[in-house]
């Protein structure tokens, strides 16, 4: 098993302290690129640690960073830049990326985190290498023209038992460069219901971006 280096810490973003967990390849192994993992309202960076996603990504050669979003997890004291369900400024996630020095990256965005990732995705200056939405909210708040301009390779993931996954897909399918992974028998946090299928699909997608 490949050696993996684990760490955690905080970054300052617009005067707010945000907690993060990180896993990267050990033994001085070169990093392919960075993957930023966001989370839903009932979850946190700990979800990705416990599921093994951080470890699996680092084993495969990626720098994996999971943050606790403002007001949640160990970032509970941080004020969110927008009310839940409203689009946050794209510059907020850009500031997170800068503070973590992630460079060209892939963003994994389940559920609640759509309010942060979608504005970042459609920003003209976006440096996203790849986008992995998992039944995110706010997909109806992006217009068709903005979706059509996005060239970022996208893996749309959702469980077939999740109505939000189906409804968000109706908007996300407007992204020109997308593929779809539907997990049979899985609900809203489909990655928890089908972790092996999640990790296989994610790693296959990332491999093609290298």
UniProtKB/Swiss-Prot annotation:
Alphabetical keyword list: Acyltransferase, Cytoplasm, Nucleus, Phosphoprotein, Transferase
Pfam families referenced in this protein's UniProt entry, alphabetically: Abhydrolase_6 (PF12697)
Record flagged with keyword Acyltransferase: yes
Name this protein carries in UniProt: Putative protein-lysine deacylase ABHD14B
InterPro entries (alphabetical): AB_hydrolase_1, AB_hydrolase_fold
The UniProt record lists the keyword Cytoplasm: yes
EC code: 2.3.1.-
Summary of the function given for this chain in its UniProt record: Acts as an atypical protein-lysine deacetylase in vitro. Catalyzes the deacetylation of lysine residues using CoA as substrate, generating acetyl-CoA and the free amine of protein-lysine residues. Additional experiments are however required to confirm the protein-lysine deacetylase activity in vivo. Has hydrolase activity towards various surrogate p-nitrophenyl (pNp) substrates, such as pNp-butyrate, pNp-acetate and pNp-octanoate in vitro, with a strong preference for pNp-acetate. May activate transcription.
GO cellular component entries: cytoplasm; cytosol; nucleolus; nucleoplasm; nucleus
Residues recorded with modification Phosphoserine: 91
Catalyses which reaction(s): L-lysyl-[protein] + acetyl-CoA = N(6)-acetyl-L-lysyl-[protein] + CoA + H(+)
Subcellular location: Cytoplasm; Nucleus
Enzyme class: transferase
Family under the similarity heading: Belongs to the AB hydrolase superfamily. ABHD14 family.
GO process annotations (BP): positive regulation of transcription by RNA polymerase II
Lineage of origin: Eukaryota, Metazoa, Chordata, Craniata, Vertebrata
Species name: Rattus norvegicus
Active-site feature positions: 111, 162, 188
Record text on subunit structure and interactions: May interact with TAF1.
GO molecular function: hydrolase activity; protein-lysine-acetyltransferase activity
């Amino acid at each position: 098993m490949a050696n993996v280096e684990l760490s955690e810490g905080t970054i300052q973003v617009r005067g707010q302290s945000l907690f993060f967990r990180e896993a990267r390849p050990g033994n001085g192994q070169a990093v392919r690129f960075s993957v930023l993992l966001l989370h839903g309202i009932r979850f946190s960076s700990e979800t990705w640690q416990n599921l093994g996603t951080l470890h699996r990504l680092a084993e495969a050669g990626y720098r994996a960073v999971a943050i606790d979003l403002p007001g949640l997890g160990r970032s509970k004291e941080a004020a969110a830049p927008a009310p839940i369900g409203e689009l946050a400024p794209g510059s907020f996630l850009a500031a997170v990326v800068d503070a973590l020095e992630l460079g060209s990256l892939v963003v994994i965005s389940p559920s609640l985190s759509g309010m942060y990732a979608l504005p970042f995705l459609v920003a003209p200056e976006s440096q996203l290498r790849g986008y992995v939405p998992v039944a995110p909210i706010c997909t109806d708040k992006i217009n068709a023209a903005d979706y059509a301009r996005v060239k970022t390779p996208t893996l749309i993931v959702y469980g077939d038992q999740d109505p939000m996954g189906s409804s968000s897909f109706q908007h996300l399918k407007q992204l020109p460069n997308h593929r779809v992974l539907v997990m049979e028998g899985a609900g809203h946090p489909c990655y928890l219901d089908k972790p092996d299928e999640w990790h296989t699909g994610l790693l296959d997608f990332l491999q093609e971006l290298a």
